[in-house]
Amino acid sequence: MLERIRDSFTESIQTKIDAAEALPESIEKAAEMMVQCLLGGNKILSCGNGGSAGDAQHFSAELLNRYEIERPPLPAIALSCDTSTITAIANDYSYDEIFSKQIFALGQPGDILLAISTSGNSGNIIKAMEAALSRDMTIVALTGKDGGAMAGLMSAGDVEIRVPSNVTARIQEVHLLVIHCLCDNIDRTLFPQDEQA
């Protein structure tokens, strides 16, 4: 068991090294898009399933509260938090529509959808992306593996941040780091006077 634990750390480190080579430009582009969205008076909606739902909530919490510097709250909504809404939609319609119906109600042109799926094939995330596109929103997708069906929905104005791994746990670990990079870039761009040395 000790060897398995050490292997998990080693694999996680290697995946992050690979991601450090592959992802910085797309992370920077996504952060710039988010900054422009927020400066334009818009908001960022986020969604995911399971651990990715936790990541969506984590991102939203960092924007609504703060990341590492003191600053005003920034508008973000995690679509995985309202159990009454989610269960009503799943019961009356379909689990695949739990995020898309919220996007049709809350999403506005100029908003961003942060869509998170390690496989890129989650049905409700695909529907969420389709809803966002119909609302003239921009999409930032956090994926892994081969990008799945989500990769095929991306337009030139969207950004896919695809973790170079086929292991769900490693993808999730890098997704969290990507989220922290996005939050850091947003904060440091919007509030440069608060930047620490």
Curated annotation (Swiss-Prot):
SUPFAM superfamilies in alphabetical order: SIS domain
Cofactor comment text: Binds 1 zinc ion per subunit.
InterPro entries: GmhA/DiaA, Phosphoheptose_Isoase, SIS_dom, SIS_dom_sf, SIS_GmhA/DiaA_subfam
A Pfam family reported for this protein in Swiss-Prot or TrEMBL: SIS_2
Pathway: Carbohydrate biosynthesis; D-glycero-D-manno-heptose 7-phosphate biosynthesis; D-glycero-alpha-D-manno-heptose 7-phosphate and D-glycero-beta-D-manno-heptose 7-phosphate from sedoheptulose 7-phosphate: step 1/1
Cofactors demanded by this protein: Zn(2+)
Name of the featured protein: Phosphoheptose isomerase
